[in-house]
Amino acid sequence: MKKSLNTICYRIFTNLANPTRIAVIEKLIDNPMSVTELATALGQEQSMISHNIKPLIQCNILTSHREGKKHILTVNLEIVAPLFDAIESHAEKFCPVAGKCLNEE
């Protein structure tokens, strides 16, 4: 059975609504790396990074492939680049005017 757009959007945006996951994506956009390298680069425990990459891999936001003993993580730019461009465009166009997108509540 095909999932509704509401369900799909909820799952994707829930997976992205986490500062650690966004930091992971930002780090990996230009430089694929292993979980260990990523944990070091972000100053996080490897277990925390592993916990946060699992849902990103399940939604195909990240991909993983093996190089020797390492699992190398890569950002799926086919989905992430246009999504981040749309978010950035929205923030530039509407947030300075409305001021609500960037305010913390």
Q: Where are the language model's segments positioned?
A:
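Amphipathic alpha-helical dimerization/coiled-coil segments
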Residues: 1-8, 80-105
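N-terminal helix-turn-helix DNA-binding core of bacterial DNA-binding proteins
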Residues: 4-47, 60, 67-80
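Generic alpha-helical secondary structure signal
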Residues: 14-17, 55, 88, 94
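Residues within the DNA-recognition helix of helix-turn-helix
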Residues: 52
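Short hinge/loop at the helix->beta-strand junction immediately C-terminal to the helix-turn-helix recognition helix
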Residues: 55, 60-61
